[in-house]
Amino acid sequence: MAEGAELIQKFYDETLSNGNMDAIDDLVTDDVVDHEEGLPGQPEGKEGVRFFVSMMREAFSDLKATVGPAVESGDMASAEVTITGRHTGEFMGVPATDKSFEIKSIDIVRFEDGKCAEHWGVTDNMALMMQIGAIPEPAQT
């Protein structure tokens, strides 16, 4: 795995899977810019990263992220990420359902001195909401 993809995997392992909030200081710049649409109430910058990780860990257990195919160019890396977990706490007004989920996301990260300085992302939130039972799955024809 290339260096940028390794840093993306390390971020997910340390924060989302292990709950190591101190790792955010080691892996994210103080003035990080996140271009992905945030969760309701999510602040900007590094505090927004902490908010995201905390909210996800409060709502889901057994969180695991696996970095798949990745490409790198200069100070940037892009990776497909598979995220799995179980819905064991309230998430955006949806009470815990104890349902498991598996979703995909794409992360594009610009690094400065080995830290995430800028992030663009797309996450399949529709699949997440369907899998935890918040919205119905489409009818099969």
Annotate each language-model stretch with its function:
Residues 1-141:
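C-terminal and inter-domain tail/linker signature
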